[in-house]
Amino acid sequence: MKRDELISCFQDTQRISNGTMLRDATERARKSNRVYREVFEAEEVKFCNRTKIIVEENTTFAAAAKYKSFGKTAVLNFANPVNPGGGVVNGAMAQEECLCRSSNLYPCLTDANVFEDYYGYHRRRNDYLSTDRLIYTSNVTVFKTDDALPQMMDREKWFAVDVITCAAPYTANLRIGEEELKRVFRNRVKNIFEAAIDNDVEVLILGAFGCGAFKNPPDIVARAFYEVIQEYEYHTIFKMIVFAIKSTVKGNQTGMCPNIRAFNWCFKKKFSILGDSISTLEGYNPHGYRVFHEGQTCQRTGVSRIENTWWGKVIHALDGELLVNNSWSGSRVTKVPGQRGLFPSGCSDERTGGLHTNNVNPDVILVYLGTNDWAFGADPEEFEAAYNLMLQKLRANYAKSEIWCCTLC
């Protein structure tokens, strides 16, 4: 995309924003501006039964158009903390510039009622970490598409959306530890959520905040969002929280965009498997475990990839992610004859305690055990006792996880 085309597009957007069609709407949006300072907390909170959290490849305004029918919608503008609109006047292409080319947001950001308290404040600080301050603007009008070079939309497709303008840390010029950076993001994210709550937002469009031009690691940013949402129970307040993330994978590149992968890992439902032979797959079970689906067996059975397995199909159908597959070929729920201890039985401490990784617990534990107990004639009372022991240990180790028992009827 040529820079002069982007500059021309932005200039056209400004003419329309301040022209007869939008002058009044732009003025109302300007007057609605409010600067929220650090450590803000909303006083009144309306609770929702359950928040749907979505991670999808999309752009910010396109996601707003898609989900605005579900309730009052606000989007996060990944702001430049010292220059309104970032480099939009010069044809820059980061997220904020795209928003300013498609809407009347820019005149709101340059208005005197927020400039000194937000941009002037950050200019005086001259700090690459920026601050948790933000601007909340109501009813910004989106009238151009969210394409690389926005095009005018038909009038009936125009829509209004609230915009939260907040800057991420700029880490390209910073030396900062991961935990400290996550702490900075946690505080900033909390302020964003509290401002949204204060304005009765029902659908909040977020994204890979600061993971583009500002060079923040997506794993840390995604984790900060996840921890804040869980700790402050924001998943009980909004109807929808949407992470709209533009893919960075171009042309003939393969693999998932790192930003999307990081947010998927945090927010998609995580499954762990506790199973026997049919649940094993070469490369997916702990080192040293007995595996059935490996080598020539994979060729013979046609089970050579995760999408060929029963559990892979279940996880895919439920739009989830595999966390741990703790399956051992030939294992039973009951004690295996000849073994000194319970391991590798399904009721052993090693099996029932090995379904998490890196302090991340599963949302769902899929238990696929019992076939070998039946095949080798395990005593029903012994089986019942072992199964109850297994469930008891799973509940103790993973109190918040759902346990799906797939082989009992």
Question: Where do the language-model regions lie?
Answer:
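Structural beta-sheet core signal
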Residues: 75, 243, 273, 367, ...
